[in-house]
């Protein structure tokens, strides 16, 4: 994406790149704060102080090396700055590079200081090609050729969790994917069973190129 010789988006100007960065951050269990918030956090309301305490408790239980309350607090602060605009009006400014993923609309501020809200539902700038890339990446960690709709929606590290989609939005992405791509089949069976079948292997590099087809 940022290669000096052939770059799709060297100056971080395209929403595709922002969504890819979000996917890489929030689908990686090693990046605990990001992964926990988008996959495990029990509420759409995030309180920074409570979140810090939750992560400290998890760290103590899991015996994280080099963990301290201060390092986790800084991590939570970094997360908040990444996803929310620094100005009170929530507008994009020249200083918005400090909050590169704010324009994705995944996290919003509330009227309570230190509180944020996860925005679940349709994501207007999340393209079909980015969704397909994320789906394929998620699938690479699975062992089955068929995945249920529910697993794709609610499994930890899944596109449904990481992108905070609702079921209607997920269905729309899958239906569009089946129409435009020969790689996946979305089916609805008896009793309302919905599942996705991967019909062939796909090159990750090709999927990445597809995301930037207009400028590649």
Where do the PLM segments sit?
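Donor-sugar nucleotide-binding helix/loop cap in glycosyltransferases
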Residues: 1-216
């Amino acid at each position: 994406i940022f290669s000096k010789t052939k770059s799709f988006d060297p100056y971080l100007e395209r929403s595709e790149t922002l969504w890819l960065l979000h996917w890489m951050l929030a689908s990686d269990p090693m990046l605990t704060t990001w992964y926990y918030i988008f996959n495990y956090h029990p509420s759409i309301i995030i309180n920074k102080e409570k979140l810090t305490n939750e992560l400290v408790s998890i760290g103590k239980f899991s015996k994280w090396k080099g963990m301290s309350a201060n390092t986790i607090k800084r991590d939570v602060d970094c997360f908040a700055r990444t996803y929310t605009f620094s100005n009170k009006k929530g507008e994009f400014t020249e200083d918005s590079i400090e909050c590169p993923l704010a324009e994705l609309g995944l996290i919003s501020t509330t009227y309570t200081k230190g509180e944020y809200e996860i925005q679940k539902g349709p994501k207007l700038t999340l393209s079909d090609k980015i969704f397909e890339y994320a789906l394929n990446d998620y699938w690479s960690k699975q062992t089955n050729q068929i995945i249920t709709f529910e697993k794709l929606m609610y499994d930890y590290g899944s596109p449904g969790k990481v992108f905070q989609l609702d079921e209607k939005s997920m269905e729309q992405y899958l239906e569009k994917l089946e129409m435009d791509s020969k790689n996946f089949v979305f089916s609805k069976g008896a009793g309302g069973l919905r599942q996705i079948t991967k019909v062939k292997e796909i090159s990750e590099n090709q999927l990445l190129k597809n995301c930037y087809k207009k400028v590649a």
